[in-house]
C-alpha cells in the first residue's frame, strides 16, 4: 500500500510503501479489545483494602442476650450490618496484571495500525525531523500542518528523541511515542496519527517477522 510522505511544512515530497501484512490486514476487533483490557489492567495499582469483621476495632462481646429482649439477635458489634462494623466481601490488595499471548498482542498492534491507516485523512507519514530548540511552539507549528487539536494526537517516532518529546510536553492531548514503546490503547483512541518515516520503516520490519 502506497502512502504520501510529507515534509514538516505539509508539502508532498515522495511516497512510501506500507506493508500490507502490517497496515492492511483484516481487523481483529477481539484482539484489540483484549490488548486494551490487558494494558489497562496492568496499570492498576490494586491497593484498595477494607477491614473485615475480624479486623475492625471493637468488642466481640454479645451486645445483649439472645432471647427475651424483643430485639433482633446480634452476636457482635463488629458485624457488617452495624455502623462501624466490618465490611462484607470488600476489596483486598491484589495484582490485576496478567500476561497476554504474544500472538494476540502482535495481531492487536497490526489490527489497530490497519484501522488507523484505513483513514488517509487522519493518518499522515512525514519525513524525519529534529527540533533542536526543544520549544513547544516549533512542534505545534508542524502539527498544525497535519492535524487539528480537537482530539487526541499521537506522533510515532523511530527512536527515543528526547528533544521532540520535550517540545510536546505542554501540548494538550498530544502523545509522543517511540516505536518500541507503543500501546494499543494510545493508537486506538488517537483521532490523528502522525508517523515519521523511520517509525513506519521499523514497524514494517518488526511486525512482518
UniProtKB/Swiss-Prot annotation:
Keyword RNA-binding annotated: yes
Biased amino acid composition, Basic residues: 59-71
Pfam families: Ribosomal_L4
Single GO molecular function: structural constituent of ribosome
Keyword set includes Methyltransferase: no
GO cellular component terms, A-Z: ribonucleoprotein complex; ribosome
Segments of this protein annotated with the region Disordered: 46-71
Keywords: Ribonucleoprotein, Ribosomal protein, RNA-binding, rRNA-binding
Biological processes per GO annotation: translation
Family per similarity comment: Belongs to the universal ribosomal protein uL4 family.
Protein task: One of the primary rRNA binding proteins, this protein initially binds near the 5'-end of the 23S rRNA. It is important during the early stages of 50S assembly. It makes multiple contacts with different domains of the 23S rRNA in the assembled 50S subunit and ribosome. Forms part of the polypeptide exit tunnel.
Subunit structure: Part of the 50S ribosomal subunit.
Name of the protein this chain belongs to: Large ribosomal subunit protein uL4
Organism, scientific name: Borreliella afzelii (strain PKo)
Gene for this chain: rplD
